[in-house]
Curated annotation (Swiss-Prot):
It is a multi-pass membrane protein. One of its GO terms (biological process) is carbohydrate transport. This is Bidirectional sugar transporter SWEET3a. Its main location: membrane. Residues 1-6, 64-74, 123-131, 188-191 are extracellular. Gene3D superfamilies: 1.20.1280.290.
Length: 246
């Protein structure tokens, strides 16, 4: 019974992730239209790519037991496609300095991922230890992304404007994190449940901040764009914070 429930929860989480993955499309339509990345940061997308790569590998039978995490593998693989596309667009329109920085960071996370795959495949022969190792890498990569929602909340508090943290995105981020946390709890998988537990807490905090500052009538101050500041790992992915978001 529990495997069936877990699979259904995984499907629900995957659908939520697909919507979140596609959300930055609006941001990059703006980048393409203006032929400039302006003040946008690519770091959240690079971190999201690392998480998606790691959890794609984590879901494979080589790491997990059989296809117990098939939904994780599938949706994370889709996330790799989305994040890779966003990063490519960013690099194409970025000035030389930012272009080099992004390519260096992307190369670094790809190198770490390749080393993770190689080490877990050829140096670790115990299946359980292999799963713990890859899951730990995924856990670290996921937690590293949670500074971004804090940046968004800081901007809301500073400017007293929720313009860059839309309600429906914060709500949907919470829903997605709760779904994948339930998936991890049902399967007794701490490497999926833990990061999404943190994501759920961040989602609740965002909603609290939104409720407090949505009533403020003060005109927002001029800010640098933080659309990409609100990132969520599901079991990993990210979400932008400007109405445009595994």
């Amino acid at each position: 019974m529990f495997p069936d429930i877990r699979f259904i929860v995984g499907i629900i989480g995957s659908v939520a992730c697909m919507l979140l993955y596609s959300a930055p499309i609006l941001t990059f339509k703006r980048v393409i239209k203006k032929a400039s990345v302006e003040e946008f940061s690519c770091i959240p997308y690079i971190l999201a790519l690392f998480s998606c790569l790691t959890y794609s590998w984590y879901g494979f039978p080589v790491v997990s037991y059989g296809w117990e995490n098939m939904t994780v593998c599938s949706i994370s693989s889709l996330g790799v496609l989305f994040e890779g596309t966003f990063i490519s667009i960013y690099v194409w329109f970025a000035p030389r300095g930012k272009k080099k920085q992004v390519m260096l960071m992307a190369s670094l996370i790809l190198a770490v991922f390749c080393m993770t795959v190689f080490f877990s495949s050829f140096s670790i022969h115990n299946h359980h230890i292999r799963k713990v190792f890859v899951g730990s890498v995924g856990l670290v990569s996921s937690i590293s992304m949670y500074g971004s929602p804090l940046v968004a909340m800081k901007q809301v508090i500073r400017t007293k404007s929720v313009e860059f943290m839309p309600f429906y995105l914060s709500l949907f981020t919470l829903f997605t994190s709760l779904t994948w946390m339930a998936y991890g709890v049902i399967g007794r998988d701490p490497f999926i449940a833990t990061p999404n537990c943190i994501g759920s807490i961040m989602g609740i905090l965002q909603l609290v901040v939104y409720c407090i500052y949505s009533k403020c009538k003060e005109a927002p101050k001029v800010l640098h764009d933080i659309e990409q500041a609100n990132v969520v790992k599901i079991p990993t992915s990210h979400v932008d914070t400007k109405g445009h978001n595994p």
